[in-house]
Amino acid sequence: MPRNPARIGLSGHPHRLISHEKEALIVPDVSEKKSVTYADAGVDISRGDRAKERIKFLAQKTFNRNVLGGIGGFGALYRLDMQRWKNPILVSSADGVGTKLKIAFELGQHHTVGADLVNHCVNDIAVQGATPLFFLDYLATGKLDPEVTEDVVSGLADACKANGCALIGGETAQMPGFYADGEYDLAGFIVGAVDRDKMVTGAGIKPGDVLIGLPSTGLHTNGYSLARKLLFEVAGYKPTQYVTAIKEKAGAALMKTHRSYLSVIQKLVTAGLTTGMAHITGGGITENLPRILPKNTGAQIETGSWPVLPIFEHLRDLGKVSEEEMMRTFNMGVGLIAAIPAAKFTRAKNLLDRAEEKFYVIGRVVKGEHRVQYT
């Protein structure tokens, strides 16, 4: 037995020896240790409070008369304007930015990912005829950086304001040990409204309807895991490296902001010129277009009827990616498809031309299998 068993412990730390009939337990003596705080565990509440103060001002810029209360309540309050809709249907969607964030981390470019998220969510409900009402975000990180958080939320707020949507709340989570240093995840939730008799569901789509495609700005928010593998692993590019094949830097090509189609969608819907619309996201045209097609109808898409962006051509060449894989992974330069009854096509064309909205006739709705055929 040591001379002073009460002072012997692991790693030289003092312990108390508690004797029992069958065994002796060594209990750490914490009387001399300092108090451990939440900040010691990696969660700095004061830093979080500073970030919230920065965020509050940005969010308030998006408020309208229907937002009740401010940022900081347990729940965000929004008044549904019953004079605006006779028989309102709420339409909601939730999404994230995906591994596009990895490029944002490397480039230190955080403002645009906020816009990516809002525009993606706006498009998802707008294709059903809904007007965006309010948006909430979720940002999680290992160690909170108030400046980065402000940059992200600034992008969210700017996009919300541009889409007529109020940023009424959200969650900023500090999760030490869960995320790598300097990284975060970002997700959003949107709610919009549409009168029941104005919903756009695709139920009215018929064989013979013309399919028009509206151009995308790039990958938008989908296919980034494959794109990153091809550009950064296979080709060995750096995000800041100029790539001759696409005539711009690799990172710049990948960080182009997800386009909002709200304005053009509202024009088509208000004029009663579309029977259904598809937001082309993960799964490409192959997976997304059938989501709006009625039973016993399919889509015939004419490849080559729209210009494929250089970034997609280069990705295909780098990985010898099959056409089938490309079409079900990327938007290939088409971010939105609208079905237009043949009898209304001229009116739709004139409307889009007046609005200076570029579009391409990319195919037709056909009778038959519920799938996309490429010709």
Regions found by a protein language model. Name each.
Residues 57-217:
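Glycine-rich phosphate/pyrophosphate-binding loop regions near the starts of catalytic domains
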Residues 48, 84-85, 97-100, 195-198, ...:
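Short, acidic Gly/Pro/Ser/Thr-rich loop/turn segments
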Residues 26-40, 57, 148-166, 179-186, ...:
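Glycine-/charge-enriched secondary-structure boundary and capping motifs
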Residues 1, 8, 18, 26-30:
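Short hydrophobic transmembrane-like helices used for membrane targeting/insertion
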Residues 205-233, 237:
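Mobile "lid/hinge" segments at catalytic clefts and subdomain interfaces of large enzymes
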